[in-house]
Structures are given as C-alpha cells and as structure tokens.
Curated annotation (Swiss-Prot):
Name recorded for this polypeptide: Phenylalanine--tRNA ligase alpha subunit
Keyword entries, A-Z: Aminoacyl-tRNA synthetase, ATP-binding, Cytoplasm, Ligase, Magnesium, Metal-binding, Nucleotide-binding, Protein biosynthesis
Family annotation (InterPro entries): aa-tRNA-synth_II, aa-tRNA-synth_II/BPL/LPL, Phe-tRNA-synth_IIc_asu, Phe-tRNA_ligase_II_N, Phe_tRNA_ligase_alpha1_bac, Phenylalanyl-tRNA_Synthase, tRNA-bd_arm
Main location: cytoplasm
Cellular compartments annotated: Cytoplasm
MF-aspect GO terms: ATP binding; magnesium ion binding; phenylalanine-tRNA ligase activity; tRNA binding
E.C. no: 6.1.1.20
PANTHER family, sorted: PHENYLALANINE--TRNA LIGASE, MITOCHONDRIAL, PHENYLALANYL-TRNA SYNTHETASE
Chain's gene name: pheS
Organism in which the protein naturally occurs: Salinibacter ruber (strain DSM 13855 / M31)
GO BP terms in the entry: phenylalanyl-tRNA aminoacylation
Catalytic activity: tRNA(Phe) + L-phenylalanine + ATP = L-phenylalanyl-tRNA(Phe) + AMP + diphosphate + H(+)
SUPFAM superfamilies noted in UniProt: Class II aaRS and biotin synthetases, tRNA-binding arm
Complexes and interactors: Tetramer of two alpha and two beta subunits.
Length: 336
C-alpha cells in the first residue's frame, strides 16, 4: 500500500483542472466520502501491521492536504479569470493623475552647469566625500597650521583605522584635482561635481552642506586669460548675456595668483539696488600642488575653479535664502 500513495500522488499532480466542473469531479474522485481514492486508503489502514500504521497515516494525510490545495488553487485561478472578463472598461474616460514630482532646483542647476562645461570641452569626474588629510589639505598646499584644519571649520571622522591618516568630510571638491592628477597625465580638462561640508554657522547665504563644481585644466601654456574666458562663457550661458561679473584678488593655498568672482544680484530692498554675490574662487594651480602629484611645474601650467551650485541657483531663480533648498517644502519645489 505505500506504493499506492506514490502512484496516487503522481495522478493528483498530473490531473488537469480547467473548469468548476472539473474541480468538483477532482474532489469526488480523490476526496469523496463514498468513492474517493484517499478515503478508501484510510479504510485500509487497519489491514497494515501496527508498526507501519503511523507512517502510512502521516503520508496519507499529507496527500489529502495536497489534493485539497490543488482544488483551492484551481478555484482561485478560475475566479481571477472570471473577474478579468468582467464588465467592459471605457478607455475613453480620463484617467486619474497621480502626484507628479519635479527635479530639485539644485539638480537642475548642476545639470545645466555640467551641460555647459561639456560644451566647453570638460569631462566629468566624481570623487569620495570622505577624504584623507593628504588629499583634502596637504597635497593642496595647506600648511600644518592653516585655520581650515581646525575642528571649528572641518568635520573630522573619529577613530581612523590604526596606521592610517585622519579622515574628514571633504571641505571642497579640490581633492578631485589631486586624485585626477595622480591617475592621469596632462593634458587634463575635467569638472568635478559633488557635496562638500563645512563646520560653519548657517545663514541665508551659507550652510553646513552645499554643492560645488571643481574645474581643472592642465596643459602647456595655460594662462589666466583662458581662465577668464571660460568663466565669462559659463556665466553668460547660465545667467544671460547681460550678466555683470567682478573679479577680486584673493588667496587660496592651492592657486597663485588667486581670485574670487562675484555676480551682481538685483535686489529692490537694497539701497544700491542690488548686491554682489560671490559664486566661485579660482586661480592658477600652485607649483607646489603640481609637485605633490609629480607633475612638472616648469613644463605645465593650469587653472582651477571651485564654484558654489547653491549660489548660482539662487541667482538664476531669485531665491534670497539658501536654507530653503533643504526644507523639502513641496510648495517651493513644485515651482521648478
């Protein structure tokens, strides 16, 4: 009789059930009280030796459960098929519109900046947000006592792995310069977008997290005039042909000479009718930076630019408070 269970299981699995009538016939054939195959085997348990009865009964109960599962599965399938063929749907009726999201204004501005830069011949490279002290400071000609290395200006990660140098949340995208020049030989023309972090006070025009785009161009005979031409081309494409720029001498450890660039921002509440908004720092790559990555400063020159995406988005859209970008206010985001 144990072999009969195996044979009956094969029959149950092979049986086709394609209608409610076939499901009822299947039930009667295998589970029917008077003539079902499985109840008939239950009646024969008493003919088995006592030691075989428990195992035979267990297997027979499992077979009974499987037969019932086949019936339940078939009924559920047939019900779904019946529902699918239910009342007709008028496809000409207007649909229900779900909530439509929008691209964040910072993402829009960043995408536009990178699109313009691609047209100017710059490729794109991304670097890590957690940087070593070497890439973030030392290789960029920051002296050991530079204020940027202090805890009040930089987020340092606690407990670096033993034998490794300190790690920080990058304070600028300039470490991308170092990583690219370590991996490539000139000529190099690249843009490095990314988030950066500063341990500084939050105000209407500064935040502890913001976005930058770094530009690096290294080749023979690169000049400051080429740098200014690229920045004018970028500003006009982004803000319009009538944009007003101002270059101011400045200081950065990794460029010499250095400059900051401001854009005139019309402001009706200002006594002067507007104000200058700083959007980027720039300059010619310092020879010490080239030497840190084994690039010959006697042969190559280059320029570097670090621009703030938030500031540019504020100028493009007339936004007067940087903090609103991070409030996730749908009323604000829906405008873009």
């Amino acid at each position: 009789m144990p072999d009969e269970i195996d044979q009956l299981r094969e029959q149950i699995e092979a049986e086709s059930i394609e209608s409610a009538e076939e499901a009822e016939a299947f039930r009667i054939k295998y589970l029917g009280r008077n003539q079902g195959a499985i109840p008939d085997l239950f009646d024969q348990i008493g003919d088995l030796p006592p030691e075989e009865r428990p195992e035979f009964g267990r297997r027979l109960n499992a077979l009974k459960d499987r037969a019932q599962e086949r019936i339940d599965e078939a009924k559920a399938r047939l019900e779904r098929q019946e529902q699918a063929g239910g009342p007709d749907i008028d496809l000409t009726l207007p649909g229900r519109c779900g909530f439509k999201g929008s691209t964040h204004p910072l993402t829009q501005t960043l995408d536009e900046i990178l699109r313009i830069l691609r047209g100017l011949g710059f490729s794109t490279h991304e670097g890590p947000e957690v940087e070593t002290d070497w890439h973030n400071f030392t290789a960029l000609n920051f002296p050991p006592d530079h204020p940027a290395r202090d805890m009040q200006d930089t987020f340092f990660l606690e407990d670096p792995p033993e034998g490794t140098e300190p790690r920080v949340l990058r304070t600028h995208t300039s470490p991308g310069q170092i990583r690219i020049m370590e991996a490539q030989t000139p000529p190099i023309r690249v843009a490095v977008p990314g988030r950066v972090y500063r341990n500084e006070a939050i105000s209407y025009k500064s935040f502890c997290l913001f976005h930058q785009v770094e530009l690096l161009y290294v080749d023979e005979n690169v000049t400051m005039a080429q740098l200014k031409q690229v920045l004018y081309s970028l500003a006009r494409a982004l803000f319009g042909e009538d944009v007003t720029l101002r270059f101011r001498p400045s200081y950065f450890p990794f460029t010499e000479p250095s400059a900051e660039v401001d854009v005139w921002w019309d402001d009706e509440d200002s006594d002067d009718g507007g104000q200058w908004m700083e959007i980027l720092g720039c300059g010619m790559v310092h020879p010490n930076v080239f030497e840190s990555v084994d690039v010959d400063p006697e042969r190559y020159t280059g320029y570097a630019v670090g621009m703030g995406v938030e500031r540019m988005a504020m100028l493009r859209h007339g936004i007067d408070d940087i903090r609103i970008f991070y409030e996730n206010d749908v009323r604000f985001l829906d405008q873009f």
